């Protein structure tokens, strides 16, 4: 069973941590500001 090998567990943890940090960075830098801009423009359009 590969789950009992310590290197397998460390490998899984490291890859999960790296993928999570990359996803969080991508969301905060690229994806979420677009949604914020869309919502702000909707608010301004509705106030007209």
From Swiss-Prot:
A GO CC annotation given for this chain: proton-transporting ATP synthase complex
Pfam family, one: Fun_ATP-synt_8
Cellular compartments annotated: Mitochondrion membrane
Keywords: ATP synthesis, CF(0), Hydrogen ion transport, Ion transport, Membrane, Mitochondrion, Transmembrane, Transmembrane helix, Transport
Transmembrane segments: 4-24
GO molecular function: proton-transporting ATP synthase activity, rotational mechanism
Membrane topology note: Single-pass membrane protein
Main location: mitochondrion
Protein origin, superkingdom: Eukaryota
InterPro entries to which the protein is assigned, alphabetical: ATP_synth_su8_fun
Record function comment: Mitochondrial membrane ATP synthase (F(1)F(0) ATP synthase or Complex V) produces ATP from ADP in the presence of a proton gradient across the membrane which is generated by electron transport complexes of the respiratory chain. F-type ATPases consist of two structural domains, F(1) - containing the extramembraneous catalytic core and F(0) - containing the membrane proton channel, linked together by a central stalk and a peripheral stalk. During catalysis, ATP synthesis in the catalytic domain of F(1) is coupled via a rotary mechanism of the central stalk subunits to proton translocation.
Family as reported in the entry's similarity comment: Belongs to the ATPase protein 8 family.
PANTHER family assigned: ATP SYNTHASE PROTEIN 8
Record's subunit section: F-type ATPases have 2 components, CF(1) - the catalytic core - and CF(0) - the membrane proton channel.
Protein name from the UniProt record: ATP synthase protein 8
Organism of this sequence: Aspergillus amstelodami
